[in-house]
Amino acid sequence: MGYRVAIVGATGEVGRTFLKVLEERNFPVDELVLYASERSEGKVLTFKGKEYTVKALNKENSFKGIDIALFSAGGSTSKEWAPKFAKDGVVVIDNSSAWRMDPDVPLVVPEVNPEDVKDFKKKGIIANPNCSTIQMVVALKPIYDKAGIKRVVVSTYQAVSGAGAKAIEDLKNQTKAWCEGKEMPKAQKFPHQIAFNALPHIDVFFEDGYTKEENKMLYETRKIMHDENIKVSATCVRIPVFYGHSESISMETEKEISPEEAREVLKNAPGVIVIDNPQNNEYPMPIMAEGRDEVFVGRIRKDRVFEPGLSMWVVADNIRKGAATNAVQIAELLVKEGLI
């Protein structure tokens, strides 16, 4: 049995990756409908060798008959249009932050809390977590189940693709100018030069000094893990890498767990690849995660501050597992559980 699938934001980075991932994972698509903004109307995209013309969202659209809609068109579009799709009986899987903290909308990472997917029926919407949260909780969950986790301190090293097409252009243009000895072009996306630099600034700052991105990692983790007591302190940094977010994670556990035990539970965890042989220079890197759907974990060691505790290094492709792949996995889960 196949499904009628819509993609909203089809021409963007994540939207195009939805198409790739649906094809690679052989999701049973019977019909495909592509939506984007008016400026992208009429563009042609390819799926499984067939061309599809992009439509603009407008009030005349009827969404009846569509089974699943994958949204990645920004929060305002999701706020306006996701309920309209849901009203027509469509299950919406939304990649924006618009619905993540809504108590009636499940926030799902299939390797971590698949049981929550059934709760979509309240509003017809399932939220995809933030990219940096997804890879962190996939790596934390096996350790949480084995030893419990009280608190986490995480520093992220996030690729520019997480900030969109203009951010990618900034890094390309600035790097080219620097290499050619030319004047550095004005940044389109970032407040400062990103090439050969690091910006401890992702999303807006709040009065307490934390950013919105850093708060997402706290509140989304609590919701996904069903644990309001877990503490997360994050520092999120944008670095001059095109694809692949990296995270340095230290955690205090409830019970003692050795690095060897942690490696073992992580090796057996779904969606995780352990690469942890630093003596031979083997550890996760963004370049190795690019184009992959797994979360890579390495540098697993006893933490020197938290007792008991562990430290580790976690890397994933932010556009795939951090966005498109996770959404498609949610769709697969809906099919597997017979929920659509």
Swiss-Prot record:
| Involved pathway(s) | Amino-acid biosynthesis; L-lysine biosynthesis via DAP pathway; (S)-tetrahydrodipicolinate from L-aspartate: step 2/4; Amino-acid biosynthesis; L-methionine biosynthesis via de novo pathway; L-homoserine from L-aspartate: step 2/3; Amino-acid biosynthesis; L-threonine biosynthesis; L-threonine from L-aspartate: step 2/5
Q: What is its EC number?
A: 1.2.1.11
Which residues are the active-site ones?
131 (acyl-thioester intermediate), 245 (proton acceptor)
Residues at which phosphate binds? 100, 216
From the UniProt record, give one GO term of the biological process aspect: diaminopimelate biosynthetic process
UniProt keyword NADP present: yes
Looking up SMART domains in the UniProt record yields:
Semialdhyde_dh
Superkingdom assignment = Bacteria
Q: Where does substrate bind?
A: 158, 238
Q: Which family does it belong to?
A: Belongs to the aspartate-semialdehyde dehydrogenase family.
Role according to the record: Catalyzes the NADPH-dependent formation of L-aspartate-semialdehyde (L-ASA) by the reductive dephosphorylation of L-aspartyl-4-phosphate.
Return the protein name: Aspartate-semialdehyde dehydrogenase
Q: Which organism is it from?
A: Aquifex aeolicus (strain VF5)
